[in-house]
């Protein structure tokens, strides 16, 4: 049978999602816990391979197993064998043609900036601290130039392995909740470091170092060297993955927990 799981994790102490030799990853910890429940080796496939330090509230994985277990066992049993910073949120049986990555139609990320002169001791790895005052309205206005299908070479990591820089951004919103600025972006898919590179350049606009139209110009140049530095991994969350309704994938609160859902 094939099982899909919803996964939440604090990526602060992991070297990203993907299993690697000699370092700890989220995938490694999850597979170890699932293998205990299944009493057999389990390999998982995820919707999005997040980088070192990046978090997830809406990650989706699937795996195949011959072990017959109640769905609640894949949740409670796995959680009992996971470290405190990784948790299974739900489990469903899915059809054989479901794939956590290839069946996805969109992914959604939130980047959380703590915009205050002094840093906070609470959630130091859960938000990105930026001490200069930022104009979130200008950041939002600039972000609208990125909507639609475009070549995102200006916001693509140099070592990106994707065959094409073209992506379709469905939604980009920048809002302020007290001292928190939230950059909320959804697209069909993302090139490597795309969200963090976009945020880095939006911060330049928010600080007043660049005009709103600079983002439009950057997009047209298709040159990563002209854009701002990559924003820190802290503060980035994979919050949702969209699938066709026929797969029956549950919808849950986006998070992270300290933000109101939308």
Curated annotation (Swiss-Prot):
The GO molecular function terms of this record are: RNA binding; tRNA pseudouridine(38-40) synthase activity
Reply yes or no: does the keyword Iron apply: no
Catalytic residues, per the record, are 51 (nucleophile)
Q: Which reaction does it catalyse?
A: uridine(38/39/40) in tRNA = pseudouridine(38/39/40) in tRNA
The disulfides recorded in the entry are: none
Example GO BP: tRNA pseudouridine synthesis
Q: Which Pfam families match?
A: PseudoU_synth_1 (PF01416)
Q: Which residues hold substrate?
A: 109
Entry EC no(s): 5.4.99.12
- EC primary class: isomerase
The record's section on Gene3D superfamilies has: Pseudouridine synthase I, catalytic domain, C-terminal subdomain, Pseudouridine synthase I, catalytic domain, N-terminal subdomain
Q: Which InterPro entries match?
A: PsdUridine_synth_cat_dom_sf, PsdUridine_synth_TruA, PsdUridine_synth_TruA_a/b_dom, PsdUridine_synth_TruA_C, TruA/RsuA/RluB/E/F_N
Going by the entry's taxonomy, the superkingdom of the source organism is recorded as: Bacteria
The record's keywords, sorted A to Z, are:
Isomerase, tRNA processing
User: What does the function comment of this entry state?
Assistant: Formation of pseudouridine at positions 38, 39 and 40 in the anticodon stem and loop of transfer RNAs.
Entry similarity comment: Belongs to the tRNA pseudouridine synthase TruA family.
HAMAP family reported for this sequence: TruA (MF_00171)
Q: How does it assemble?
A: Homodimer.
- Report the protein name in the record: tRNA pseudouridine synthase A
**Native source species:** Actinobacillus pleuropneumoniae serotype 3 (strain JL03)
Lineage summary: Bacteria, Pseudomonadati, Pseudomonadota, Gammaproteobacteria, Pasteurellales
